[in-house]
Amino acid sequence: DDRRLAMFEGVYSVPDGVSYNSYLLLDEKTVLFDTVDEAVQKVFFENVAHTLAGRKLDYVIVQHMEPDHSATLEGILMRHPEAVVICNKKTEAMIYQFFGADLKMNVQIVGEGDVLKTGRHELTFLMAPMVHWPEVMVTYDITDKILFSADAFGTFGALNGALFADEVDFFADYLKEA
């Protein structure tokens, strides 16, 4: 949770803060889905290291380049230079625009319907341009039927420790904004 912001990107009022959603899949291969904003980088890096528990990070899937999803990508790659960055062609160009042409990374470009097998899990990539940026893609875990949706279904507001939909009161927490 990030409650330090009054305005998100200097445009949107966020009186209830924001949350940054990055996910780590532990399988035969480890996969990080997006990163987070620099404001919470210290705890993010600590959480990733703790969850990996000494394992290497195999993949970083970059679904969206907005800074609240990607600002700590360079820091992750410095800590895990072995990680392969999975992204689409538009995202690759944007990564170098954001972080500079000298950023060291191993890249695997994916397109619509491509599949990455991580062990038990099979991840398929679906392009979702203009969810609100042109490079957005989402990742679907075929095995567990989970959609990692980038910004497609996002909302503002800190989660107050909640991780799952059934841990929040929809009417009290979200309907008031509608």
Each predicted region: which residue ranges?
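Residue-level marker for buried hydrophobic side chains located in beta-strands
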Residues: 31, 61, 146-149
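Zn-dependent metallo-beta-lactamase
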Residues: 1-29
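Metallo-beta-lactamase
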Residues: 87-178
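Active-site metal-binding motif and surrounding structural segment of the metallo-beta-lactamase
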Residues: 28, 39-86
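Divalent metal-coordination and catalytic microenvironments
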Residues: 25, 34, 64-66, 139, ...
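Active-site beta-strand termini and strand-to-loop segments that position acidic
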Residues: 25-28, 118-119, 141-143
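Active-site environment of divalent metal-dependent phosphoester hydrolases
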Residues: 3-4, 65-70, 93-94, 132-133, ...
